[in-house]
């Protein structure tokens, strides 16, 4: 068993998800983080060690996180920009007076917390999602410009954009505050669109629309997405999972990537986890789907793990609030960004 697998296996307890419809249950209760503990350099809960991953150089609010092929942490951040009531008008158009962010917005950070490279100045308006494809190139979403961009990792230049700059819309050529992007090895692009349209769109490698994924119909569950905030693509299982934030659930669908006579078309419901809190980010590693949630009326902020092969689930890191982005390193260490206070947490399982 590889180290990263062993690290994640330690989470699992006998709880299950199954084919639709299904209810989600959470496992052993843990004490919330004590008042003031969140400001400590390191604090320990029952099953995890949580420390502050403070980069050597100050960066802004981190809206997107990823781990590159070298094992470095990549942070997509907003520099000094803050998303508030002045950022957009009633038609979802970004406030042109704010202009582009002139500072660098992408930081590459070593595991020793040293900022080893920065770029992205003069490109983005309100950074949001980040992923790294199989070739090591970066994909980001900018809710300010209503676009998705591919950035060449070597040149650090935008080489492809989807959506019309600064123009929100709901047709095939426009997005409205897209939140996240996932890219398959064959070049197919999945976009969570997002805060306004609440839909999932699939494009080919050239940016041509292939399919739209709609929310699965489940008993006693909403029939539409409400802020699909994060995506996770599990290619060898032909699954794409959606963090349906305001519906407090994760829904997983066929990704339409397999070939042959038994290929499932894109968007067939596969499984789901419901009533788990407002899910801000999901990421997969070795068939474990890891997620972070925010506070809701019935469920406190926490993280969860789902074994996508067996359906076993568990929760952990209860009380870690205001999270937004998640990345998982090869050794199973998890990195979680918080917007308030603005920082990155490093979470190791005991």
Curated annotation (Swiss-Prot):
Disulfide bonds join 176-196, 241-252. Residues 1-19 form the signal peptide. The keyword Iron-sulfur does not apply. The gene is pgal-1. It is found in: Secreted. InterPro entries: 6-blade_b-propeller_TolB-like, NHL_repeat, PHM/PAL. Its cofactor is Zn(2+). GO terms for molecular function: metal ion binding; peptidylamidoglycolate lyase activity. GO terms for cellular component: extracellular region; membrane. This is Probable peptidyl-alpha-hydroxyglycine alpha-amidating lyase pgal-1. CDD domains: NHL_PAL_like (cd14958). Keywords: Disulfide bond, Glycoprotein, Lyase, Metal-binding, Repeat, Secreted, Signal, Zinc. PANTHER family: PEPTIDYL-ALPHA-HYDROXYGLYCINE ALPHA-AMIDATING LYASE 1 (PTHR10680:SF36), PEPTIDYL-GLYCINE ALPHA-AMIDATING MONOOXYGENASE (PTHR10680). NHL repeats lie at residues 46-90, 113-154, 162-206, 212-256. It catalyses: a [peptide]-C-terminal (2S)-2-hydroxyglycine = a [peptide]-C-terminal amide + glyoxylate.
């Amino acid at each position: 068993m590889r180290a990263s697998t062993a690290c994640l296996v330690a989470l699992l307890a006998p709880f299950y998800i199954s084919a639709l419809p299904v209810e989600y249950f959470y496992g052993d209760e843990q004490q919330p983080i004590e008042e003031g503990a969140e400001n400590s350099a390191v604090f320990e809960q029952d099953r995890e060690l949580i420390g502050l991953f403070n980069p050597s150089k100050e960066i802004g609010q981190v809206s997107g996180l990823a781990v590159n092929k070298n094992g470095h942490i990549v942070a997509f951040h907003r520099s000094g920009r803050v998303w508030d009531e002045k950022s957009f008008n009633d038609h979802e158009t970004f406030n042109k007076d704010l202009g582009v962010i002139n500072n660098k917005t992408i930081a590459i950070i070593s595991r020793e917390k040293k900022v080893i490279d920065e770029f992205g100045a003069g490109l983005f308006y309100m950074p949001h999602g980040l992923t790294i494809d199989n070739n090591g190139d970066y994909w980001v979403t900018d809710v300010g410009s209503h676009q998705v961009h591919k950035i060449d990792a070597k040149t650090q230049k935008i080489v492809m954009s989807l959506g019309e700059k600064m123009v929100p819309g709901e047709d095939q050529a426009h997005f409205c505050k897209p939140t996240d992007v996932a890219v398959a090895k064959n070049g197919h692009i999945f976009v969570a669109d997002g805060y306004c349209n609440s839909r999932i769109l699939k494009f080919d490698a050239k940016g041509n629309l292939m399919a739209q994924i709609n929310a699965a119909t489940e008993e006693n569950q909403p029939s539409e997405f409400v802020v699909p905030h994060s995506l996770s693509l599990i290619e060898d299982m032909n699954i794409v999972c959606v963090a349906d934030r305001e519906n407090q659930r994760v829904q997983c669908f066929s990704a339409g990537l397999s070939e042959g006579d038994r290929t499932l078309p894109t968007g067939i419901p596969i499984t789901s986890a419901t009533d788990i809190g407002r899910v801000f980010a999901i990421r997969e590693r070795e068939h474990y789907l890891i997620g972070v949630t925010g506070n809701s009326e019935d469920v406190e902020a926490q993280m969860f793990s789902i074994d996508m092969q067996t359906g076993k689930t568990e929760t952990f890191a209860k009380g870690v609030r205001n999270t937004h982005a998640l990345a998982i390193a090869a050794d199973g260490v998890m990195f979680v960004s918080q917007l308030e206070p603005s920082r990155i947490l490093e979470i190791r399982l005991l």
